[in-house]
Amino acid sequence: MSRIKKARKPGMSSQPVVVTRNRTDRDVESREIKRKRKRKGLKAGARNAESNAEQARRNAQKKDPRIGSKKPIQLVVEAKQKTTKQERRLTNEQELAMLENDAQLMVLLDRLDSGENLGTGLQKYVDEKLARIEHLMGRLGLLDDEEPEEIEEFPEFAERKAKSDDDLLAEFDDFNMDDFK
């Protein structure tokens, strides 16, 4: 039998059928999963192609670090003057002011005043700072001398300090050990 060709003639069918589809979330998710399954593996011909990360790394290695610097370069080199120890060292007044305003030292002194025991490291820190403050006050003349009172209490020590070496040697020779028995 011979084939009969269908002809399209207007009015043959009543009205064109319009189909509307509502895509639910599940349909969209299933399509994404299906697309991912189809695209497993690497791209075709990617065996010899370099990745972008590798290309960027190689370009970074080839780049000359001298090119593109915006930092101004001095043509004449000026020698830097080194500060001497005396210039770097604080004056006694400045150091004393810094030690008196030391917040950590003040907190530790308050803890000591309240009767709290400090650890060995903290106690050593406090002792060092207080000794330094006392030394600086002595150098600046702000320290009240308590030594003359001690000399008045023990006059025999004051006499010994005033003697010369010859006097001490003569006293040693004349010393009688029987006095201590």
Curated annotation (Swiss-Prot):
Gene Ontology MF term list: GTPase activator activity
Region annotation (Disordered) ranges: 1-73
Leader sequence segment: none
Taxonomic superkingdom: Bacteria
Biological processes annotated in GO: ribosome biogenesis
Residue stretches of biased makeup (Basic and acidic residues): 22-32, 55-67
Keywords, ordered alphabetically: GTPase activation, Ribosome biogenesis
HAMAP family: GAP_YihI
Job of this protein: A GTPase-activating protein (GAP) that modifies Der/EngA GTPase function. May play a role in ribosome biogenesis.
NCBIfam families cross-referenced by the UniProt entry: PRK05244.1-1
Family: Belongs to the YihI family.
Subunit structure as annotated in this protein's UniProt entry: Interacts with Der.
Protein name: Der GTPase-activating protein YihI
Organism for this UniProt entry: Aliivibrio fischeri (strain ATCC 700601 / ES114)
